[in-house]
């Protein structure tokens, strides 16, 4: 057993450990912690063990305790350690009471940060996290480094710990839900931007901003910070930086960071030297927002990997699933899956990547974020708007109240289901048109997450005759 794994074993052996929820990462850890000698309690809103489906058999086999139903948080009392799932609000009173009573409240990601023996690169922001995180991991891989990729991007990190060597690198996508309670920061920290998001979950915008700042606050020099220059909030984070802070910017030149030069070259300026490293025309990724993601990723790894690795990946990488992902061309109409568009800013970035007006399918779960900024972009870039979900009426109101709506010729329709939305969009399309699913909303009214939503859209589109 490696030193780090041994330290984790010493932390949990003989301890009373509560897990909030049985998501994918917690299922793996529950089994591991039982094996390490912990007394595990699973706290969950489900009413009975049978409600866990196929996992019920594992629960019975492991012999773990259960605290279920309406009062599942009663199981927090008397625990030595509580593992919080990111979706569980950190400032809920039962959890804060447990902290006051001396319980260690942590999470899978926090434990990984505590015991990881290798360098960690962390990426957060309201938009661009996953593409930037993926690019960074591919830059390191192209340079021959072994990469452990995880966090909010999908894979649990702590189970990887036995395979992590000091010379490796961990590349971690971090959400505000994960960051809000973290007390360690990565060696290299990237903040892409901060715009209103998840305000259904956070108390207010300031709590959301403070959660994002946590990626910087616990860094120990030597360290590196990469901040988006175009965003007022990320620019305000400079006083939080403890190491070598650099910018990335598409719209300005800088003598300290990565930027898009007027001649179409992506450049890095550092220590008085400007190095052009990639031509915009050679980039396969669609959209100007992806130029920003490339700049952010390059600024993060600059000096850590050869320029040739950045050039190779930058000129061949075609994107991540659900991000302006081409699905199919049918009857001369191209369908795109941009289900990652869970906020207005994401959808705006997607719309701006098209050079003609599109047919947009939008709407979903309401995160209580404003839609007024979306309205002028819809009027400028959309010819037919198909709305669904709880935010459909809010998006329609914002668009219809915009002074340019009356003269725009924009048509608005409403759909009850994704199938219905695709049918309406198809009926409105002419050869040469593009139909894009970019909801500007979360998925939770109809789907567990944006991935499931995007895959249903693709399935429906691919089954069209």
Give the ranges of each region predicted by the language model.
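N-terminal leader/targeting and accessory segments in enzymes
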Residues: 1-107, 111
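Nucleotide phosphate-binding/pyrophosphate-handling subdomain across enzymes
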Residues: 8-16, 26-36, 146, 277-384
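Residue-level signal for inorganic ion chemistry
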Residues: 33, 82, 123, 152, ...
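Phosphate-binding loop of NTP-binding sites
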Residues: 35, 73-77, 86-229, 233-242, ...
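Short internal beta-strands
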Residues: 39-47, 225-229, 361-362, 381-390
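Short beta-strand "acidic-cap" motif of Rossmann-like dinucleotide-binding folds
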Residues: 40-44, 149, 171, 247, ...
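Beta-strand->loop->alpha-helix junctions that form or flank phosphate-binding loops
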Residues: 41, 69-70, 106-110, 242-261, ...
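C-terminal helical cap/extension that packs against the catalytic core
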Residues: 56-57, 374-432
